[in-house]
């Protein structure tokens, strides 16, 4: 088994001499990223990547993930490593403090995420997809969606996914056929199937927030007719905690070379009446 040793000298050079870290930390909101803080974070990230994530890389690729009755079990050690990842605050590193993030420069969080990817790419795909969901909600989410979902996504207690590809629509999003039917109360029922969904189903978080591309009934053809919906794996109770299971299930798994420990799911939306989502 190969050992991962983070190239901290190269990372520091890239951050300081190429990306002008000194200038970035002088910007409003970035002043807490002092040289001592940055160095400490890089050192701890290198330690976590080398001692926790790297040893699981080969284990995960040999074991893979297991699917049974729509549920997915991740490889040995992944769930525990993710719990440690969340408890240590790594997921919140570069996120907005308004929603529980640490507000550190994106340059730093990018350097840290590079260590996750280099030491265990299959593991790193989960927080990477969650980060994408966070960014999408920050830009396009409603105030209610931000308040409900962002704190748990930022902390890493919940994970996020991106649902674009369909059996008849790969990179051609104009061909997306998943549909969203309005219920009348501000929600929609989502119907369709999505494939190649990274971490579309797993056991590492209490909930999964799916961002799903679908068409409303009167939507025009092509990409202009596509809308993005928030579809949680579990509907939320009045206290904001996961409750009843939503109508989205993993019906099988794909297998990708080199990342067998990353569950690549085929997700069915609406086979039992419609998956509830919000625009």
PLM feature segments, named:
Residues 168-171, 201-203, 220, 256-262:
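Short Gly/Pro-enriched turn/cap motifs at secondary-structure boundaries
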Residues 187, 191-241:
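A short core secondary-structure module
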Residues 1-124, 148:
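Amphipathic, small/basic residue-rich leader segments at the start of a protein or domain
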Residues 196-198, 235-251, 256, 263-279:
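A glycine-rich, basic-preceded beta-loop-alpha segment at the flavin cofactor/substrate interface
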Residues 129-130, 141-182:
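Internal maturation/activation junctions in enzymes
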